[in-house]
UniProtKB/Swiss-Prot annotation:
This is Sugar fermentation stimulation protein homolog. InterPro entries: SfsA, SfsA_C, SfsA_N. One of its GO terms (molecular function) is DNA binding. It comes from the Bacteria. Pfam families: SfsA (PF03749), SfsA_N (PF17746). The gene is sfsA. Belongs to the SfsA family. HAMAP family: SfsA. It comes from Methylorubrum extorquens (strain CM4 / NCIMB 13688) (Methylobacterium extorquens).
């Protein structure tokens, strides 16, 4: 996914009220950008980090910029990280169209925001191609506390735990369901940050035990755009989840 307009570079001054970030542009101008990320952003919101903003062309929008990327000092070295949690669903849809998601190859359509469970909407419902419908839940990942290991979540994620329970319900009822973790950076493996949220850890493991599938993909991230790139293994006790090779 290429950014439609060139991103604007700046230096992070502070992130506050979760969804706001003050950024100093190269000419010294201070702007406030929308931070589309409700998480803790551990290791990513350090003052002085280089950031990239996408400008808005909507004259009615209150904030003229959205924070897209940060060049973070992570274990193993600096790298660009995507922090916009609105991007992963679009990245999955793009990868589906390009036949890059091996577990979903053969399906004809990927319909977004379909009602299911008690009171939820699944991110996607894959259907067609003579295959059983598949409920797909997408999670964004940008936490790295150990070199090469991406983790989720970076804060308590009660809603995500509920999603795992509802995916498990789909499989228990005879359907197919999967979790796709979109890692907006380079990594060699994925694991649950169980010390941060043991409830989500238990919910995911229980879902895997009943047959919910789980896949994790890193992304190629840079000033020009973000794209799903490489499958990586998931290190989850009680389940063996192999990386799903991309195709095409």
């Amino acid at each position: 996914m290429r950014f439609p307009t060139p991103l604007i570079e700046g230096r992070l001054v502070r992130r506050y009220k979760r969804f706001l970030a003050d950024v100093r542009l190269p000419d010294g101008t201070m702007v406030t950008a929308h931070c589309a990320n409700p998480g803790a952003m551990l290791g990513l919101n350090t003052d002085g980090f280089r950031v990239l903003l996408s400008p808005s062309t909507n004259p009615l929008r209150k904030l003229g910029y959205s924070w897209e990327l940060v060049e973070a000092e992570l274990p193993g070295g600096p790298q660009w990280v995507g922090i916009n949690t609105a991007r992963p669903n679009a990245l999955v849809a793009e990868a589906f169209r390009e036949n890059k998601l091996a577990p979903l190859i053969g399906y004809e359509t990927l319909r977004p925001e379909v009602a299911y469970g008690k009171a939820s909407r699944v991110d996607f419902l894959a259907s067609g191609g003579g295959r059983p419908p598949c409920h797909v839940e997408v999670k964004n990942c940008h936490l790295m506390r150990h070199a090469g290991l991406a983790e989720f979540p970076d804060c308590k994620a009660a809603r995500s735990a509920r999603h795992m329970e509802e995916l498990a319900g789909v499989v228990t009822a005879g359907g197919r369901a999967m979790l796709i973790v979109v890692i907006q950076m380079r990594a060699g493996a994925f694991d649950v940050a169980r010390d941060i949220d043991p409830v989500f850890d238990r919910a995911l493991r229980m879902a895997l035990e009943v047959g919910v599938e789980a896949y994790a993909y890193t992304c190629a991230v840079g000033p020009e755009g973000v794209a799903i790139d490489t499958p990586v293994p998931i290190l989850t006790p009680g389940a063996t989840v192999q990386p799903a090779r991309t195709s095409g």
